[in-house]
Amino acid sequence: MAKGQSLQDPFLNALRRERVPVSIYLVNGIKLQGTIESFDQFVVLLRNTVSQMVYKHAISTVVPARNVRVGPGGGYVQSGSDTLQINDDEVE
């Protein structure tokens, strides 16, 4: 796995597994809301009244509605914050 995805995948997986409502802001300013149904290397499947496939390159920010733990013994991501707080040993 690429070093750049060592935080992205656990974060998205925690949001998916816990069904945390998220706001996803796109690079063009559009705000999408829903829960993450699935994701892969290139897309996120967002579910609200319908499922939407959103390309990751179009995503600017993912904001969870509540705090989410990232990884076992890892830090957390605060809701409404652009700051990720994680253990120092996970960051190079």
UniProtKB/Swiss-Prot annotation:
GO terms for cellular component: cytosol. It comes from the Bacteria. Keywords: RNA-binding, Stress response. It holds the Pfam family Hfq. GO terms for molecular function: RNA binding. Residues 9-68 form the Sm domain. GO terms for biological process: regulation of DNA-templated transcription; regulation of RNA stability; regulation of translation, ncRNA-mediated. RNA chaperone that binds small regulatory RNA (sRNAs) and mRNAs to facilitate mRNA translational regulation in response to envelope stress, environmental stress and changes in metabolite concentrations. Also binds with high specificity to tRNAs. Belongs to the Hfq family. Homohexamer. This is RNA-binding protein Hfq.
